Each structure stands twice: as C-alpha cells, then as structure tokens.
Amino acid sequence: MRIISYNVNGIRAAISKGFIEWLQHSNPDVICLQEIKATEDQVPFLDIEMAGYPYQYYYPATKKGYSGVAILSKIKPNNIVFGTGIEHMDFEGRNVRVDFDDLSVMSLYLPSGTNIDRLSHKFMFMDDFQNYVNELKKEIPNLVICGDYNICHKAIDIHDPIRNANVSGFLPQERDWLDRFLKNGFIDSFRFFNDQPDNYSWWSYRAGARGNNKGWRIDYCLVSETLKEKLKRAYILPEAKHSDHCPVVVEIE
C-alpha cells in the first residue's frame, strides 16, 4: 500500500494549481490531506472520483475556510471514524481515520503554536492525542498516522536549528513530546530509511525559502512498530508545488 500525506493549504487553491492531475499521475492507494479549508460541498467530488478516488472522507472545521482534514482512497475501507470524540480536539477538524483489513490510516493536522493561546491549545491537544492513541492501539495495533505535526523532531529536520530554538515547531517541549510519542511504539518512516540532512516538507513563503531549501520537516508518516517488517520505502516529493508544504510518502507491504 502506497500512502501519501499532503498539507495542501487549501484544497481549492491546490486544485487550481493542478493537484488533481498530479494525484492521478502519482496514483497512491490512499492520500491523507490536511488544511483542506473547505466543506465537502466545496470540493469537486466527481473530478476526484474520475482521478481514481471514489472513497472520499472530508472532516472540515466548524469555522469556515480553516483547518480540516480528508482521506481519499482507491480502496473501500471497512470503517471510517471522524475525530476523536474529544470536543476541544474535534471542532477544528483535525483527524479522520479509515480502517482496512490489515491496518488503519489516519490523517492528522496537529495545531500550530502561533501565539501564547494557540501554544497552550497545542500542548493540550498533544497530551490528549497521545492518550487517545494509547487507547486506540489496544484496539487497532497497526496504525499509520500521517499528517502535519507542526513539529521538527531534531536539528537535522530544520534548516537553522540555532536561530529557531525558541520558535514554536522546534521548542524543546514539542520535540520531547514527539520523542515520547515515538517511544510509545511508532517509527518515523522517513528517518527509518534516510538519515541525510536538507530533507524538508514545509517552506515559508518569505524570501525565497523554498528556492534556497530553507525548510522544516514537519510532515510525517508515523507507523506502528508492529508494521516495521512491512516497511518498503519512505520519501519526500519536494517537486510537487501546490502548497507551501510538499507530499511525504510511505510504502507498506
């Protein structure tokens, strides 16, 4: 199974830049989208179906034009779960999950910490999401949690770790949380295969950051350790330019 995660920063804007044609060419089995910024009726369902994705699940935020996640699949899932059931996590449309025979795939959009209030919300979300996943794994051990975590894990994952040491997305508390999350039974699939620097998934729109590859790796496909032996490949697709993020990919037997 080939799974892509992609923060599209507005699905309608991405579509205007050729997203559907790119999707048809890339041809993943499942694609997890974040920051769709649209409701289901604002998305061209039939065009996406014609591209090969009849199974489409959208979970928008209550606030219009904000946040929201989706999963598009070639394969019919056995079950679909929208949100976590925890109100403060769900009103912003931050995760949707599909269950297949051998594994489950979740699209996650973890909050950013753009100011003190949002940082506090992010920390609360992180803690509650960890608890939610700990319980979920008892029921569903084979989990693939794809998405925009809004956290660079290590210095290798950010272009200027010293200057960004006190910036949300690279704070010690955030990085420690990701450490704990991984130690609770997940694998960073990209780093499982690739230990090289200068591999990023997000670039600021400012000052030619993308052209100069001054980026952050904040998008991940985290895979349950139970699936370790089935990991085949994981990589990043920086040439896809429908967003300020780029797609990240994992392939599982």
Residue ranges of predicted features:
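Active-site beta-strand/loop signature of hydrolases that rely on acidic residues for catalysis
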Residues: 7, 23-41, 105, 133-155, ...
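Active-site beta-strand termini and strand-to-loop segments that position acidic
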Residues: 74, 98-101, 224-225, 250-253
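Metal-dependent phosphoesterases centered on the DNase I-like endonuclease/exonuclease/phosphatase
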Residues: 51-55, 127-214, 218
